[in-house]
Amino acid sequence: MLSDFQTRLEEVERLVREDREEVGKRAGVPFIVFTYDPADEIEVDEEVRSLIEKLEYHDQTVAGIDMRDLVFSVLEERGILENVIDLERRDRDQLLSGLKSSLLDDGEMGQLASAIASQAENADTVIVYRMGILYPFASASTLMGQLETNTPDDTPIVFCYPATVDDQSLRFLDESEGTYYRARVIGHE
């Protein structure tokens, strides 16, 4: 018998392989939010890699985006990674404010959203995982809002996020991190 986790992952696979048009039909955007318990992070990493392999086996071009790696590479490209690490030790509040403006506030679309949108242009499916790194300086809701009009309508984007869903609000570590009503949410119990 499949666990709840595996059943929900199979639903994601079915949607992006067989029912792609269903992903955005109800909400108008091709986004899926797959939530999971933060304690399952290692299992999620393994299962996401397995899902990517399955989709590629079925002739899909998949952009697997490790958000942690993306955040570090953006900070490194800007030449501020070492400063961020130093500032984290000294002044966490200033760090959070600076990271938000560095990664999300760049006019209409921040650097993280730009990188995801760029990869979505050449992919059949995008899977973004290890998104817990965004909290608390950024919200998944803000990121999805920036991507909403900047990604292809026919490319499903799956966001694997360690959170719970409470009345359509994502909750990370028992704090509401924003509301995004348009994504299809495949939540855990």
Language-model-detected regions and their locations in the chain:
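Conserved P-loop NTPase "ATPase switch" module shared by AAA+ and STAND
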Residues: 122-137
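Long, charge-dense
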Residues: 63-113
